[in-house]
Amino acid sequence: MKRIYLLSLFIFSIGCEDNIEKIDTNELLIIASEGNFGSSNGSLSIFKGKEKIQTIDDVGDVVQSITTYNNKLFVVVNNSHLIKVFTITESGLKLPGIDINTNNSSPRELIVHNNKAYFTNYNSQDVKVLDLETYYIEKSIKVNGLPESIVSDGKHLWVAINMNPDYSSANSVVKIDPENNQVINTYEVGKGPQQ
């Protein structure tokens, strides 16, 4: 019995791999902390290698998501109804950044496609189009329901509608043509689709 135990232990130990990933000490890691609803205490923590090099407190009320594009960080702040844009430098984020008011839209998720930012919005039930040169919201694409996740396949945008306007569970995915910013089709899928 003792030999079986030792043999099992030996087989187990040689079967383990060292999968510890090395940390690139020149790369920045940005962690968004949502904060408490209604408290405006969402925050960002920036690490370089293993060292925390910057903390940005009180970013807003519910940091929903972050997206990087070129040397910019886009922070979607849901309950503050804004998008914050920071320039990314080797030493962290350049402050104070730019605030883009979304007019009480309750923004959720953001992607960049062809130098324009597309972001989903619960309150306005749409996908807004943000020009990245002027930071002007140039268009709103209406959808039927509360849009959440948004992805691009390189040609089209796909938006998950996971809740209806009455907050009941929805089951559709919307396909958008970013060339003309129009909804092409709506597909019925399972309840509560996500990315």
Identify the residue ranges that each predicted region occupies:
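Bacterial Sec-dependent N-terminal signal peptides
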Residues: 1-23
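Predominantly soluble domains enriched in secretory-pathway, periplasmic, or organellar proteins
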Residues: 16-195
